[in-house]
Amino acid sequence: MADGDGSSVKKRRKKDKRSLPDEDVADIQHTEEFLIKPESRVAQLDTSQWPLLLKNFDKLNVLTTHYTPLPSGANPLKREISDYVRSGFINLDKPSNPSSHEVVAWIRRILRVEKTGHSGTLDPKVTGCLIVCIERATRLVKSQQSAGKEYVGIVRLHNAIESEAQLARAIETLTGALFQRPPLIAAVKRQLRVRTIYESKLVEYDPERRLGIFWVSCEAGTYIRTLCVHLGLLLGVGGQMQELRRVRSGILGEMDNMVTMHDVLDAQWQYDNNKDDSYLRRVILPLEKLLTSHKRLVMKDSAVNAICYGAKIMLPGVLRYEDGIELKQEIVVITTKGEAICLAIALMTTAVISTCDHGVVAKIKRVIMERDTYPRKWGLGPKASQKKMMIQKGLLDKHGKPNECTPDSWKKEYVDYRESSKKEAAKVPQAVSEVERAPKRKRESESENEAVSPPPSPATPPPEELSKKEKKKKKKEKKAKEAAESGEEQVEVISESSAKKKKKKKKQKEVEESSE
């Protein structure tokens, strides 16, 4: 019986393990503490259930596991509600009739924030996925606007066609790079442009009403209205767009926590009246959700604030890095708590990072995190500390430069690398000017007739240059003389004309007197 009881307990444990993934993962992610700990032993846990940018962190390549964790910052899901709202976005189901700018302005008024932006304009009659970024998340708007989009639309054909297969073939033909001109009523200049259609297919066709439902995956800035007109031209019957809905923008689609304007209004009302922020946290998502498709680079806590101030992303500050990083690829730099620090352009591949121990890993493209979220950890070395003490005592000026009180030993020992780099930069143009210019090559006809003369020394200019200079001087002198002569002639002409006028006046007076 004892053996039977033992086997039943084991079975229960197995059932419990199996039931873990079926639990509400979102609640666990909000309640538990998630952090990459500074230890050499990797914990045996299921990191596929970790939230946002920390998902599967144990599968990243490890450069080092040792760093000093700082209490600053917080997991994106555990931020205070004010910070959570200011660094979030809403996957909004845009209603028909209001424009995208009106919708964004309404959300700004509802949430009482200063700044909002959206992921790409939708026409007033178009519904569907509109990503509304709030305050700090507006730094990601540019990258979201250029991301690919997916649409489901209804096209109305002006005349009947032979079969549904004909329409399906025509829709699939309109793929690849296509010429497009914006519609007659458009907010932009009607210039011819090229846009790429990645994939398109017919979903359904009603031959009685001549309506076809189609799905399109396309580049940002594609006009589906123009695509429907082209479809009608291709079939030879004419066509126009009847309805349109955006089902995906970037990496977020209809099924990814899409909310309505009423949900946003209710969530804010619930927080204002009942101090319940759970609805706001459900409606607004952290900005890190938009970056889950990027390759990751995990930085030490001590390097975070330096990057926020624009420092280079150097290899000694890197803890972990992802497989498959390529040159000039856009990556996301994150903290050990899973917060996005910045977007960057990779200057090293994964292979180079694994073999090097120094150098610049990536170039900052856009800083996302606010400055001084983490403490400053630069200027804490012995020389920097000594310099701060000397500034306090008045031995150096407020900029750290020598003054009358500065001891001679400091002037001799201390090397200001900023000034030395400026001097080197100033020397470069002088060195370029001092480089000897190569003598001009003669034409082939001249070189054949004349003997080759040795090149003149750089101290004395060649006779050709002297003769050119003399010619220029002579020309200038001639022009000056001509100008002077012309001036004298003009004066003489003016004087002659004035004398003639006086004579005429005298004659007129004499005539008048004689007549009287």
Swiss-Prot record:
Residue ranges constituting the PUA domain according to the UniProt record: 294-369
Pfam families found in the cross-reference section: DKCLD, PUA, TruB_C_2, TruB_N
Protein's gene: DKC1
SUPFAM superfamilies: Pseudouridine synthase, PUA domain-like
Coiled-coil boundaries: 463-516
GO cellular component: box H/ACA snoRNP complex; Cajal body; nucleoplasm; telomerase holoenzyme complex
Protein name (Swiss-Prot/TrEMBL): H/ACA ribonucleoprotein complex subunit DKC1
GO MF annotation: an example: pseudouridine synthase activity
Biological processes, Gene Ontology terms: box H/ACA sno(s)RNA 3'-end processing; enzyme-directed rRNA pseudouridine synthesis; mRNA pseudouridine synthesis; rRNA pseudouridine synthesis; snRNA pseudouridine synthesis; telomere maintenance via telomerase
Domain of life of the native organism: Eukaryota
Family to which the UniProt record says this protein belongs: Belongs to the pseudouridine synthase TruB family.
PANTHER family membership: CENTROMERE/MICROTUBULE BINDING PROTEIN CBF5, H_ACA RIBONUCLEOPROTEIN COMPLEX SUBUNIT DKC1
Biased composition (Basic and acidic residues): 434-446
Organism this protein belongs to: Gallus gallus (Chicken)
Primary localisation category: nucleus
